[in-house]
């Protein structure tokens, strides 16, 4: 799935070989009715029945329902949750696997914000929990990803053209995050927008706006 802020649309691709982007082809499926005219971040629930989008104009996270799991053409807007009290420039959105924690990356404060959902995957039940400034490492964070265990966090940085890695001594708790290392993508893309990892962490996928290309890396 790729989110395009030029057309304000999310596009779906099919991979004939799992996790191999060289086998990807456009599935002729898209969705654009997520109440955001400058979308920046996209995320799906674990079962593929919900789609979340954030962006600069609404300063909110929208929630859409998919009547057929993982088929983006069956999505319909359900509701949205304003995050304007914390950020006016949200760039990425991520959820814990159980849908009870939501994380948003932000370029207005160069921070990561955490929200707790009293009802899993229901953004209307979200409440602000904590924040983490990443200014020391990155002054223009574009996306966020956490490992399934919640003990590793990765921030996509536009200014540094790197993926920054953090360790969390307490799972999902931003107050326990410490910077570990970074990986530069400047040889492939110098204007980063997003990063995603395979479930087992063995592959990393990065996208940027300079080349409009997705790059696949092996991490093992």
Predicted regions, residues:
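Short loop/turn segments immediately following the C-termini of beta-strands
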Residues: 5, 56, 107, 158, ...
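A short loop-to-beta-strand structural motif that recurs across blades of beta-propeller domains
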Residues: 9-12, 60-63, 111-114, 161-165, ...
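Short loop/turn segments immediately following beta-strands, especially the blade-tip
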Residues: 14-22, 65-73, 116-124, 165-175, ...
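A short beta-strand motif characteristic of beta-propeller blades
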Residues: 27-33, 76-84, 127-135, 179-186
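Beta-rich catalytic cores
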Residues: 38, 89, 140, 191
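Residue-level detector of Asp-centered blade-edge/turn motifs that repeat once per structural unit
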Residues: 46-47, 97-98, 148-149, 199-200
């Amino acid at each position: 799935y790729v989110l395009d802020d030029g057309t304000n649309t999310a596009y779906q691709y099919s991979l004939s070989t799992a996790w191999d982007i060289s086998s990807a082809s456009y599935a002729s499926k898209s969705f654009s009715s997520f109440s955001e005219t400058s979308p920046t971040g996209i995320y799906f629930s674990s079962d593929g029945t919900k789609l979340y989008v954030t962006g600069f104009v609404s300063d909110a996270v929208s929630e859409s329902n998919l009547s057929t799991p993982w088929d983006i053409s069956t999505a319909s807007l359900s509701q949205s949750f304003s995050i304007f009290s914390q950020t006016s420039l949200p760039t990425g959105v991520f959820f814990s696997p159980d849908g009870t924690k939501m994380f948003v990356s932000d370029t207005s404060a160069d921070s990561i914000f955490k929200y707790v959902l009293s009802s899993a995957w229901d953004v209307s039940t979200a409440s602000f929990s904590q924040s983490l400034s990443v200014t020391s490492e990155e002054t223009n964070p574009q996306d966020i990803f956490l490992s399934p265990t919640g003990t590793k966090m990765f921030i996509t940085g536009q200014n540094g053209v790197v993926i920054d890695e953090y360790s969390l001594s307490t799972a999902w708790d931003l107050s326990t995050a410490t910077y570990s290392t970074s990986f530069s993508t400047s040889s492939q893309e110098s204007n980063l927008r997003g990063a995603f990892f395979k479930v087992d962490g063995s592959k990393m996928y990065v996208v940027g706006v300079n080349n409009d290309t997705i790059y696949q890396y092996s991490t093992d």
